[in-house]
Amino acid sequence: MKLKKTVVTTVVVAAMTVLAGCQSVPEARQQSVIEQLSSVSMLRQDNIAGAYEVAVAPGVDSVFVAAVPAFEPNSGGVVQRLDPRSLQVVQSIQLPRRSFALGFNPTSSTLYVGNTLDGSLTVIDATNGAVRGMIQLGERVVDGKGQVSAPHTRKVVVDPLRNQIFVTSPDSEGLVWIVDGATNKVRHTVETNGPWPAGAAFDRANNRLYVGQGGLNEVVVINPENGEIVNTLSTGDTTSADPKESKHFFVNMAIDEKNQRLFAADANTGSVYVFDLGNGKVVQIVPVGEGLLDIAYSEQRNEILATNRGVSRGSPAGTGSLTVIDGTNYSVNRRVDLPVHPNSVALSANGQTAYVTVKVPHGNDHPAWRKDAQDSIVRIDLQGG
Protein backbone atom coordinates (compact mmCIF):
# COMPACT_ATOMS: atom_id res chain seq x y z
CA MET A 1 0.00 0.00 0.00
CA LYS A 2 1.40 3.40 -0.93
CA LEU A 3 1.27 5.88 1.90
CA LYS A 4 2.21 9.01 0.01
CA LYS A 5 -0.67 11.37 -0.72
CA THR A 6 -3.30 8.66 -0.50
CA VAL A 7 -6.95 9.64 -0.11
CA VAL A 8 -9.73 7.17 0.43
CA THR A 9 -12.67 8.39 -1.63
CA THR A 10 -12.94 9.44 -5.26
CA VAL A 11 -14.78 12.61 -4.35
CA VAL A 12 -11.86 13.64 -2.14
CA VAL A 13 -9.36 12.98 -4.91
CA ALA A 14 -11.29 15.34 -7.14
CA ALA A 15 -11.60 17.89 -4.39
CA MET A 16 -7.92 17.84 -3.55
CA THR A 17 -7.04 18.32 -7.22
CA VAL A 18 -8.96 21.57 -7.08
CA LEU A 19 -7.36 22.57 -3.79
CA ALA A 20 -3.87 22.07 -5.21
CA GLY A 21 -4.39 25.17 -7.29
CA CYS A 22 -6.49 27.07 -4.79
CA GLN A 23 -4.74 30.39 -5.33
CA SER A 24 -6.29 30.66 -8.76
CA VAL A 25 -9.70 29.28 -7.77
CA PRO A 26 -12.48 31.80 -7.14
CA GLU A 27 -13.57 32.08 -3.51
CA ALA A 28 -17.02 30.64 -4.16
CA ARG A 29 -15.50 27.58 -5.80
CA GLN A 30 -13.06 27.12 -2.91
CA GLN A 31 -16.02 27.16 -0.51
CA SER A 32 -17.71 24.53 -2.67
CA VAL A 33 -14.64 22.32 -2.38
CA ILE A 34 -14.62 22.72 1.43
CA GLU A 35 -18.27 21.69 1.54
CA GLN A 36 -17.41 18.55 -0.46
CA LEU A 37 -14.55 17.74 1.88
CA SER A 38 -16.82 18.17 4.89
CA SER A 39 -19.36 15.70 3.52
CA VAL A 40 -17.12 12.65 2.92
CA SER A 41 -16.96 9.82 5.45
CA MET A 42 -13.16 9.71 5.53
CA LEU A 43 -10.36 12.00 4.46
CA ARG A 44 -6.64 11.41 4.79
CA GLN A 45 -3.67 13.68 4.23
CA ASP A 46 -0.07 12.43 4.25
CA ASN A 47 1.46 15.81 4.98
CA ILE A 48 3.07 15.80 8.44
CA ALA A 49 6.62 14.79 9.28
CA GLY A 50 6.86 13.14 12.69
CA ALA A 51 3.23 13.42 13.80
CA TYR A 52 2.27 12.53 17.36
CA GLU A 53 -0.77 13.80 19.27
CA VAL A 54 -3.77 15.60 17.79
CA ALA A 55 -6.05 18.12 19.51
CA VAL A 56 -9.27 19.73 18.26
CA ALA A 57 -9.79 23.44 18.94
CA PRO A 58 -13.25 24.43 17.67
CA GLY A 59 -13.05 27.92 19.17
CA VAL A 60 -10.27 28.80 16.75
CA ASP A 61 -11.58 26.54 13.97
CA SER A 62 -8.44 24.40 13.98
CA VAL A 63 -7.00 20.96 14.48
CA PHE A 64 -3.49 20.93 15.94
CA VAL A 65 -0.90 18.19 15.52
CA ALA A 66 2.30 17.96 17.56
CA ALA A 67 5.21 16.88 15.41
CA VAL A 68 8.88 16.01 15.75
CA PRO A 69 10.47 16.08 12.30
CA ALA A 70 13.95 15.13 13.57
CA PHE A 71 15.50 13.53 16.65
CA GLU A 72 18.99 14.98 16.39
CA PRO A 73 20.32 16.64 19.58
CA ASN A 74 19.02 20.18 20.05
CA SER A 75 16.46 19.77 17.28
CA GLY A 76 13.15 21.52 17.80
CA GLY A 77 9.53 20.67 17.28
CA VAL A 78 6.59 21.86 15.22
CA VAL A 79 2.90 22.26 15.93
CA GLN A 80 0.91 22.13 12.72
CA ARG A 81 -2.39 24.01 12.54
CA LEU A 82 -4.77 22.26 10.14
CA ASP A 83 -8.03 23.25 8.57
CA PRO A 84 -10.51 20.83 10.21
CA ARG A 85 -12.34 20.30 6.91
CA SER A 86 -9.57 19.90 4.31
CA LEU A 87 -6.80 18.87 6.77
CA GLN A 88 -4.46 21.19 4.91
CA VAL A 89 -1.67 22.78 6.96
CA VAL A 90 -2.47 26.48 7.38
CA GLN A 91 0.26 27.35 9.91
CA SER A 92 3.50 25.75 11.12
CA ILE A 93 4.45 26.87 14.62
CA GLN A 94 8.17 26.33 15.18
CA LEU A 95 9.25 25.43 18.71
CA PRO A 96 12.71 25.26 20.28
CA ARG A 97 11.90 21.92 21.92
CA ARG A 98 10.44 18.74 20.48
CA SER A 99 6.66 18.51 20.70
CA PHE A 100 4.79 15.29 21.41
CA ALA A 101 1.65 15.86 23.51
CA LEU A 102 -1.12 18.46 23.36
CA GLY A 103 -3.70 19.89 25.72
CA PHE A 104 -6.13 22.67 24.83
CA ASN A 105 -7.96 25.17 27.04
CA PRO A 106 -10.99 26.42 25.08
CA THR A 107 -11.77 29.12 27.63
CA SER A 108 -8.43 30.91 27.28
CA SER A 109 -7.65 29.62 23.75
CA THR A 110 -4.35 28.33 25.06
CA LEU A 111 -2.52 25.31 23.66
CA TYR A 112 -0.13 23.41 25.92
CA VAL A 113 2.58 21.36 24.23
CA GLY A 114 4.32 18.54 26.06
CA ASN A 115 8.08 18.63 25.43
CA THR A 116 8.48 15.01 26.46
CA LEU A 117 12.28 14.73 26.41
CA ASP A 118 12.83 18.08 28.15
CA GLY A 119 10.36 17.76 31.01
CA SER A 120 8.50 20.94 30.08
CA LEU A 121 5.40 22.53 28.58
CA THR A 122 5.39 25.13 25.84
CA VAL A 123 2.48 27.58 26.09
CA ILE A 124 0.97 28.80 22.81
CA ASP A 125 -1.73 31.35 22.01
CA ALA A 126 -4.01 29.22 19.85
CA THR A 127 -5.58 32.24 18.17
CA ASN A 128 -2.38 33.26 16.37
CA GLY A 129 0.26 30.64 17.16
CA ALA A 130 2.42 32.96 19.26
CA VAL A 131 4.55 31.25 21.91
CA ARG A 132 3.64 32.73 25.30
CA GLY A 133 6.26 30.97 27.35
CA MET A 134 7.61 27.72 28.72
CA ILE A 135 6.93 25.89 31.98
CA GLN A 136 9.79 23.76 33.25
CA LEU A 137 8.26 20.88 35.18
CA GLY A 138 11.20 18.61 35.97
CA GLU A 139 14.77 19.60 36.68
CA ARG A 140 17.07 19.54 33.66
CA VAL A 141 20.50 18.02 34.27
CA VAL A 142 23.57 18.45 32.05
CA ASP A 143 26.10 15.61 32.14
CA GLY A 144 29.85 15.77 31.52
CA LYS A 145 29.33 15.44 27.77
CA GLY A 146 26.91 18.34 27.66
CA GLN A 147 23.88 16.09 27.19
CA VAL A 148 20.71 17.41 28.79
CA SER A 149 18.23 15.10 30.49
CA ALA A 150 15.03 15.67 32.44
CA PRO A 151 12.08 13.63 33.73
CA HIS A 152 9.94 12.86 30.71
CA THR A 153 6.43 14.18 30.28
CA ARG A 154 3.65 12.11 28.78
CA LYS A 155 -0.02 13.14 28.82
CA VAL A 156 -1.30 16.72 29.04
CA VAL A 157 -4.87 17.17 30.31
CA VAL A 158 -6.53 20.57 30.81
CA ASP A 159 -9.33 21.61 33.15
CA PRO A 160 -10.67 24.84 31.58
CA LEU A 161 -13.15 25.48 34.41
CA ARG A 162 -10.46 25.89 37.07
CA ASN A 163 -7.61 26.74 34.67
CA GLN A 164 -5.37 23.88 35.72
CA ILE A 165 -3.14 21.60 33.68
CA PHE A 166 -2.16 18.04 34.55
CA VAL A 167 0.97 16.38 33.15
CA THR A 168 2.06 12.79 33.74
CA SER A 169 5.67 11.60 33.93
CA PRO A 170 6.02 7.87 33.09
CA ASP A 171 9.25 6.95 34.84
CA SER A 172 9.68 3.82 36.96
CA GLU A 173 8.83 5.99 39.96
CA GLY A 174 6.54 8.39 38.19
CA LEU A 175 5.12 11.80 38.93
CA VAL A 176 2.14 13.96 38.11
CA TRP A 177 2.53 17.72 37.89
CA ILE A 178 -0.43 20.02 38.57
CA VAL A 179 0.06 23.44 36.99
CA ASP A 180 -1.80 26.70 37.66
CA GLY A 181 -2.77 28.06 34.25
CA ALA A 182 -3.07 31.61 35.57
CA THR A 183 0.52 31.80 36.81
CA ASN A 184 2.16 29.01 34.75
CA LYS A 185 3.61 27.68 38.01
CA VAL A 186 3.69 24.10 39.29
CA ARG A 187 1.23 23.95 42.17
CA HIS A 188 1.74 20.31 43.18
CA THR A 189 4.10 17.47 42.29
CA VAL A 190 2.45 14.13 43.07
CA GLU A 191 4.25 10.81 43.51
CA THR A 192 1.90 8.08 42.28
CA ASN A 193 3.62 5.20 44.13
CA GLY A 194 3.52 3.13 40.98
CA PRO A 195 5.51 2.66 37.79
CA TRP A 196 4.97 4.55 34.53
CA PRO A 197 2.04 6.92 35.17
CA ALA A 198 1.03 7.69 31.59
CA GLY A 199 -2.66 7.98 30.78
CA ALA A 200 -4.92 10.53 32.44
CA ALA A 201 -8.57 11.58 32.43
CA PHE A 202 -10.27 14.36 34.37
CA ASP A 203 -13.71 14.44 35.99
CA ARG A 204 -14.70 18.10 35.78
CA ALA A 205 -17.83 17.90 37.94
CA ASN A 206 -16.07 16.22 40.86
CA ASN A 207 -12.62 17.79 40.35
CA ARG A 208 -10.82 14.46 40.32
CA LEU A 209 -7.88 13.39 38.19
CA TYR A 210 -7.53 9.72 37.21
CA VAL A 211 -4.04 8.57 36.25
CA GLY A 212 -3.29 5.21 34.63
CA GLN A 213 -0.07 3.31 35.24
CA GLY A 214 1.29 -0.18 35.92
CA GLY A 215 1.87 -1.96 39.20
CA LEU A 216 -0.49 -3.10 41.93
CA ASN A 217 -2.88 -0.14 41.63
CA GLU A 218 -3.27 0.64 37.95
CA VAL A 219 -5.30 3.81 38.55
CA VAL A 220 -4.67 6.54 41.13
CA VAL A 221 -7.27 9.18 41.95
CA ILE A 222 -5.90 12.63 42.77
CA ASN A 223 -7.54 15.65 44.39
CA PRO A 224 -5.97 18.60 42.51
CA GLU A 225 -6.77 21.03 45.31
CA ASN A 226 -4.16 19.57 47.64
CA GLY A 227 -2.31 17.18 45.33
CA GLU A 228 -3.19 14.16 47.46
CA ILE A 229 -4.06 10.65 46.27
CA VAL A 230 -7.56 10.04 47.61
CA ASN A 231 -8.20 6.59 46.13
CA THR A 232 -6.74 3.85 43.97
CA LEU A 233 -8.36 1.41 41.57
CA SER A 234 -6.99 -2.03 40.81
CA THR A 235 -7.83 -4.95 38.58
CA GLY A 236 -6.36 -7.22 41.24
CA ASP A 237 -4.39 -9.09 38.60
CA THR A 238 -0.93 -7.93 39.70
CA THR A 239 0.25 -9.44 42.97
CA SER A 240 3.90 -8.34 43.07
CA ALA A 241 5.28 -4.86 43.66
CA ASP A 242 8.04 -5.57 41.14
CA PRO A 243 7.27 -3.45 38.05
CA LYS A 244 8.44 -6.31 35.85
CA GLU A 245 5.51 -8.34 37.17
CA SER A 246 2.89 -5.77 36.14
CA LYS A 247 0.05 -7.46 34.28
CA HIS A 248 -1.30 -4.19 32.92
CA PHE A 249 -0.15 -0.77 31.73
CA PHE A 250 -2.91 1.79 31.27
CA VAL A 251 -1.24 3.96 28.68
CA ASN A 252 -4.24 6.20 27.94
CA MET A 253 -7.68 6.77 29.47
CA ALA A 254 -11.01 8.45 28.81
CA ILE A 255 -13.95 9.20 31.07
CA ASP A 256 -17.73 9.14 30.86
CA GLU A 257 -18.52 11.83 33.43
CA LYS A 258 -22.29 11.48 33.18
CA ASN A 259 -22.37 7.75 33.93
CA GLN A 260 -19.17 7.70 36.01
CA ARG A 261 -17.23 5.20 33.93
CA LEU A 262 -13.51 5.13 33.23
CA PHE A 263 -12.11 3.57 30.06
CA ALA A 264 -8.48 2.45 30.23
CA ALA A 265 -6.40 1.33 27.26
CA ASP A 266 -4.15 -1.51 28.40
CA ALA A 267 -1.00 -1.66 26.31
CA ASN A 268 -0.07 -5.04 27.79
CA THR A 269 -3.18 -7.02 26.87
CA GLY A 270 -4.58 -4.96 23.99
CA SER A 271 -7.92 -4.63 25.78
CA VAL A 272 -10.03 -1.74 27.06
CA TYR A 273 -10.85 -2.02 30.76
CA VAL A 274 -14.08 -0.37 31.91
CA PHE A 275 -14.25 0.75 35.54
CA ASP A 276 -17.42 1.67 37.41
CA LEU A 277 -16.27 4.71 39.36
CA GLY A 278 -19.06 4.26 41.88
CA ASN A 279 -17.60 1.03 43.26
CA GLY A 280 -14.14 1.06 41.64
CA LYS A 281 -14.66 -2.33 40.01
CA VAL A 282 -13.91 -3.52 36.49
CA VAL A 283 -17.28 -4.14 34.83
CA GLN A 284 -16.13 -5.03 31.31
CA ILE A 285 -13.03 -6.00 29.35
CA VAL A 286 -13.16 -5.33 25.60
CA PRO A 287 -10.45 -6.92 23.41
CA VAL A 288 -9.23 -4.49 20.74
CA GLY A 289 -5.90 -5.75 19.40
CA GLU A 290 -2.13 -5.63 19.65
CA GLY A 291 -0.53 -2.25 20.04
CA LEU A 292 -3.58 -0.66 21.70
CA LEU A 293 -2.63 2.95 22.29
CA ASP A 294 -5.11 5.83 22.48
CA ILE A 295 -8.73 6.09 23.56
CA ALA A 296 -11.54 8.66 23.46
CA TYR A 297 -15.20 8.74 24.45
CA SER A 298 -18.04 10.35 22.54
CA GLU A 299 -20.79 11.19 25.01
CA GLN A 300 -23.12 12.24 22.19
CA ARG A 301 -22.83 8.85 20.49
CA ASN A 302 -22.12 6.80 23.63
CA GLU A 303 -19.17 5.22 21.87
CA ILE A 304 -15.60 4.44 22.89
CA LEU A 305 -12.91 4.89 20.22
CA ALA A 306 -9.56 3.13 20.45
CA THR A 307 -6.52 3.09 18.17
CA ASN A 308 -4.26 0.09 17.89
CA ARG A 309 -1.06 -0.29 15.89
CA GLY A 310 -1.11 -4.07 15.58
CA VAL A 311 2.52 -4.15 16.68
CA SER A 312 4.01 -6.51 19.21
CA ARG A 313 7.14 -8.57 19.59
CA GLY A 314 5.33 -11.37 17.84
CA SER A 315 4.14 -9.27 14.88
CA PRO A 316 6.54 -6.38 14.23
CA ALA A 317 4.91 -5.48 10.91
CA GLY A 318 1.51 -4.63 12.34
CA THR A 319 -1.80 -3.53 10.87
CA GLY A 320 -3.67 -0.49 12.10
CA SER A 321 -7.26 0.29 12.95
CA LEU A 322 -9.66 2.50 14.85
CA THR A 323 -12.14 0.41 16.83
CA VAL A 324 -15.53 1.93 17.67
CA ILE A 325 -17.17 0.28 20.69
CA ASP A 326 -20.82 0.55 21.73
CA GLY A 327 -21.01 2.24 25.12
CA THR A 328 -24.13 0.33 26.16
CA ASN A 329 -23.32 -3.32 25.50
CA TYR A 330 -19.58 -2.96 24.71
CA SER A 331 -19.86 -4.72 21.38
CA VAL A 332 -17.69 -3.53 18.50
CA ASN A 333 -19.80 -1.32 16.25
CA ARG A 334 -17.14 -1.05 13.54
CA ARG A 335 -13.46 -1.22 12.80
CA VAL A 336 -11.92 1.36 10.52
CA ASP A 337 -8.83 -0.08 8.81
CA LEU A 338 -5.97 2.41 8.75
CA PRO A 339 -2.38 2.32 7.54
CA VAL A 340 0.32 1.54 10.06
CA HIS A 341 0.52 2.89 12.71
CA PRO A 342 -2.52 4.71 14.21
CA ASN A 343 -1.37 6.91 17.07
CA SER A 344 -3.53 9.60 18.67
CA VAL A 345 -7.30 10.13 18.44
CA ALA A 346 -9.33 13.25 19.26
CA LEU A 347 -13.00 14.10 18.83
CA SER A 348 -14.80 17.14 17.50
CA ALA A 349 -16.86 19.16 20.00
CA ASN A 350 -20.09 17.49 18.86
CA GLY A 351 -18.57 14.02 19.20
CA GLN A 352 -19.41 13.09 15.61
CA THR A 353 -15.98 13.35 13.97
CA ALA A 354 -12.73 11.63 14.88
CA TYR A 355 -9.26 12.85 13.99
CA VAL A 356 -6.46 10.26 14.04
CA THR A 357 -2.73 10.63 13.48
CA VAL A 358 -1.04 7.74 11.69
CA LYS A 359 2.70 7.13 11.75
CA VAL A 360 4.65 5.53 8.94
CA PRO A 361 6.99 2.61 9.72
CA HIS A 362 10.61 3.54 10.29
CA GLY A 363 12.40 0.39 9.18
CA ASN A 364 12.86 -0.34 5.49
CA ASP A 365 12.23 -4.03 6.22
CA HIS A 366 8.59 -3.20 6.98
CA PRO A 367 6.26 -4.12 4.06
CA ALA A 368 4.56 -0.71 4.21
CA TRP A 369 7.81 1.27 4.27
CA ARG A 370 8.19 3.89 1.53
CA LYS A 371 11.11 6.23 1.12
CA ASP A 372 10.34 9.82 2.18
CA ALA A 373 6.80 8.89 3.26
CA GLN A 374 5.25 11.30 5.76
CA ASP A 375 2.87 10.67 8.62
CA SER A 376 -0.86 11.12 8.13
CA ILE A 377 -3.85 12.81 9.67
CA VAL A 378 -7.22 11.12 9.08
CA ARG A 379 -10.68 12.60 9.59
CA ILE A 380 -13.47 10.06 10.08
CA ASP A 381 -17.16 10.93 10.03
CA LEU A 382 -18.62 8.63 12.69
CA GLN A 383 -22.11 9.14 11.29
CA GLY A 384 -21.00 7.82 7.92
CA GLY A 385 -21.35 4.17 8.95
Predicted regions and their residues:
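Gram-negative bacterial Sec-dependent N-terminal signal peptides
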Residues: 1-23
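Predominantly soluble domains enriched in secretory-pathway, periplasmic, or organellar proteins
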Residues: 18-385
